[in-house]
Amino acid sequence: LNFKKKNILFVFTTIIICFLFASIYPINYIKKNTQVFTPLNTSFKDSGDYKISKYVYLTFDDGPTIVTDVLLDVLKTENVRATFFIVGKEIVGNELILKRIYNEGHGIGLHTYSHNFKKIYRSTEEFVNEMKKTSNIIEEITGSTPKIIRFPGGSSKRLNAFTLTNLHKNNFKVYDWNVNLCDGVNPNLSVSQLIKNSKIIKGNKNVAIILMHCNSNNKNTVKALPCIIKHYRDLGYEFRAITENTPEYYYKFKTEKNLTVK
């Protein structure tokens, strides 16, 4: 009888251990395959062996548009590199602007093809497919294959372990922001308000990832940009474009749910 009890206990214990291992796999996979810069980090480490005290990433979503072209003029005058998260459907008719972004050394990221929230957030598969579609179009035009992405509206409440693991399997890296001009929800904000918003850094003050937009109605963003650049330059920040070597930055998410990886 004691022998049977011991066998039952052994089998039960083995099942529990296997279950726990399967549950934590996605989390371990993410940790091993991702270098993540979170809002709570106190320092930012480059892909090299040295630490940079202050970094600023100027990022523009929703292009390419005519406004993108004007922004590029400002960036060229200021000798600053930025990153543009491209919406696939906006490329048609703006191929030369996309080429200019690439030729002038700016970062190019993916911002889905349709920017249709109901469609892209229907499933992880749909989301990944839209990123791939936009990446393929950009590759045809520039010869480069972007792998950095940004969620329309940000990853908060949309990213989980399952989705992140699938993105990493496709070599995509996620980048949110910790400075928000609020020019997406309100493109008509005054230039002075946009400049004020650009100075509010959430989390690690040594790294500013600034969210801006380059829709056709973001003319005030263009006007504010020189002052934003001057502000961070005066504070000693170094301007960089996001590349595949830049540590990921995405908002924290709960790992208790959606842990099954197919």
Question: Where are these predicted regions, by residue range?
Answer:
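Terminal accessory/targeting
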Residues: 1-57, 73-82, 205-262
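A generic signature of intrinsically disordered, low-complexity regions enriched in glycine/proline
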Residues: 11, 65-66, 187
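Generic "edge-of-domain/loop-turn" microfeature
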Residues: 26-29, 65, 91, 156, ...
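Active-site beta->alpha N-cap acidic-glycine motif
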Residues: 33-122, 126-140, 145, 231, ...
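Catalytic domains of cell-wall/extracellular-matrix polysaccharide-remodeling enzymes
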Residues: 115-233, 237-238, 242-257
